[in-house]
Curated annotation (Swiss-Prot):
Keywords: Chloroplast, Membrane, NAD, NADP, Plastid, Plastoquinone, Quinone, Thylakoid, Translocase, Transmembrane, Transmembrane helix, Transport. One of its GO terms (biological process) is photosynthesis, light reaction. It comes from Nuphar advena (Common spatterdock). This is NAD(P)H-quinone oxidoreductase subunit 3, chloroplastic. The chain crosses the membrane at residues 9-29, 64-84, 88-108. Its main location: plastid. It catalyses: a plastoquinone + NADH + (n+1) H(+)(in) = a plastoquinol + NAD(+) + n H(+)(out); a plastoquinone + NADPH + (n+1) H(+)(in) = a plastoquinol + NADP(+) + n H(+)(out). GO terms for molecular function: NADH dehydrogenase (ubiquinone) activity; quinone binding. It is a multi-pass membrane protein. NDH is composed of at least 16 different subunits, 5 of which are encoded in the nucleus.
Amino acid sequence: MFLLHEYDIFWAFLMISSVIPILAFIISGVLAPISEGPEKLSSYESGIEPIGDAWIQFRIRYYMFALVFVVFDVETVFLYPWAVSFDVLGVSVFIEALIFVLIPVVGSVYAWRKGALEWS
């Protein structure tokens, strides 16, 4: 027999969490000032009129370096709890962590060999 009243808290939470964003959009649409004009369509750079082309393209090299940084940064975050509890954990967890470290290292060596990390 299913007791549906056990899920009352879930349904209440679901309703409230659905209504709050909808209300936020409705209230902001009602209270926001409506302004139209040429200033609305101009680009804004810290209150200064942009000189030249405001949109520049970044080279893909910057994204490659950022991606490598993020991969190793996330890996460091995951390795910290392992390093703190290293003495309690067994050899199998050490091997798993070693594999976890070797996968990004092999990927970065591959990228380095292909020239993806060259700055020039």
